[in-house]
């Protein structure tokens, strides 16, 4: 059963498997996938430990996979041109199967990762692209973009060795690393033990 709670300005999609207490739920080991058909978006915000796989495609689509009794704990919310992915408030659980969100969208201008989840984005083709990490999660990118800006506050890493770019700007506060390419210019600011390889 799926519950859709949508207002005019804040469209919340609560993907619901079983309605139960959120305290210490153990994953069933049975995988379930829910499909969400969203409005167009270009920004992805991830909060928590969910892994996200993003592919550039003409048709926007979101698929959420998890233990069938934990899918209800994952929230997908739309705010303008952004989609937020995270957990319901006070959720407490132990997974048996991996939690994975697959996203297709025609344009991706920004990824913001807060937490320990990992994000992969493939086939980027942008004029401007931004990615930020607050936490220990990693971001892996490929494709092309004229101007890219990366920021890390924590221990997460950004691997953009397969993202062709002209101009690069990197800001690191912490121990995170960035591997990237830039054919025209690179501006780097590091506060902490993080490393940048261009």
Task: Go through each PLM region and give its residues.
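Intrinsically disordered, low-complexity terminal regions
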Residues: 1-198
């Amino acid at each position: 059963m799926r519950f859709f709670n949508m207002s005019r300005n804040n469209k919340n999609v609560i993907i619901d498997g079983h309605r139960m207490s959120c305290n210490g739920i153990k994953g069933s080991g049975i995988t379930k996938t829910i499909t969400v058909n969203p409005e167009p978006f270009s920004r992805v915000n991830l909060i928590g430990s969910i892994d996200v796989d993003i592919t550039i495609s003409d048709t926007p689509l979101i698929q959420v996979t998890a233990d069938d009794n934990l899918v209800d704990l994952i929230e997908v919310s739309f705010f303008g041109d952004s989609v937020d992915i995270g957990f319901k408030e006070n959720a407490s659980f132990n997974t048996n199967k991996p939690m994975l969100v697959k996203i297709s969208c025609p344009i991706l201008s920004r990824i913001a990762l807060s937490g320990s989840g990992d994000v992969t984005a493939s086939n980027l083709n942008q004029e401007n692209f931004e990615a930020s990490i607050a936490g220990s999660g990693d971001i892996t990118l490929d494709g092309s973009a004229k101007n890219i800006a990366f920021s890390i506050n924590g221990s997460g890493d950004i691997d953009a060795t397969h993202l062709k770019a002209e101009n690069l700007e990197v800001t690191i506060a912490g121990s995170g690393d960035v591997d990237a390419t830039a054919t025209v210019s690179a501006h780097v600011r590091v506060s902490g033990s993080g490393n940048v390889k261009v």
